A protein has these predicted regions:
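Polytopic alpha-helical membrane-helix bundles and their juxtamembrane interface segments
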Residues: 1-220
Length: 220
């Protein structure tokens, strides 16, 4: 199994290469480099304790890799990419529910307002046939954010960054494109995925459980 330090070097090298590909408009290099950082996280988690939580986070990362590839291909595969990330959010949601089922009403209200507001902004600019897929995605990511906030710790931070990244995608694609969007989107996405993956490591998961008063991950 690759050492964590080697995986980190690989992820950072691929991330740098992808940023370069964005700046130079090199589609092939972008396609090859984009999924590598999340693949490195998948490999890294193989060394974490084999808990149900780790399993669901790993599944979510796997679907995220599929989404990365689909959205990097120079074709209109947005709906397929959306579906892949929808599955990723559902996997994360399942993992978070395995940690705690406490209602966390403030988190629920915040997540619902966030999802409704974002969907409202996007719909007001015309989603057309994408309205239903985007609405379903907004529902899934809002539920994922709610349960992540209920868990606290790195899970909450990662989910928040993931939602921010997806919000930037929606704004750039449907509302008002802006030059810095590709860079802000990918950086918040990678940081979010790193935080989510880190929450599945032994030390981070223990911290989450202590903060949330949840039951042991091992019993899920």
């Amino acid at each position: 199994m690759p050492r964590p330090s080697h995986l980190m070097i690989l992820a950072l090298a691929a991330a740098t290469l992808y940023i370069y590909a964005l700046a130079s408009d090199n589609t092939l290099v972008a396609l090859l480099a984009k999924p590598v950082p999340v693949l490195a996280l998948v490999a890294w988690l193989r060394g974490a304790p084999a808990t149900p939580y780790r399993k669901w986070i790993s599944i979510g990362l796997g679907f995220s890799v599929m989404g990365d590839i689909l959205l990097a291909i120079p074709a209109d595969l947005f709906v397929l990419g959306l579906a892949a990330f929808l599955c990723a959010h559902l996997a994360y949601l399942r993992g978070y529910c395995g940690i705690t089922l406490r209602p966390a009403l403030p988190a629920l209200i915040f997540s619902a307002i966030t999802g409704i507001a974002l969907l409202g902004v996007l719909a007001s600019h015309g989603l057309g046939p994408l309205l239903i897929p985007v609405a379903l995605y907004a529902l899934a990511i809002s539920a994922m954010l709610w349960r992540a906030l209920a868990c606290g710790g790195l899970a909450a931070i990662g989910a928040g960054l993931f939602v921010l990244s997806d919000s930037l995608i929606g704004i750039d694609r449907f509302v008002s494109p802006f030059a810095a969007a590709p860079y802000l989107i990918i950086l918040t996405y990678w940081l979010g995925q790193w935080a989510i993956a880190s929450s599945a490591s032994h030390r981070s998961t223990d911290k989450v459980l202590t903060q949330s008063g949840a039951r042991s991950v091992g019993s899920c």
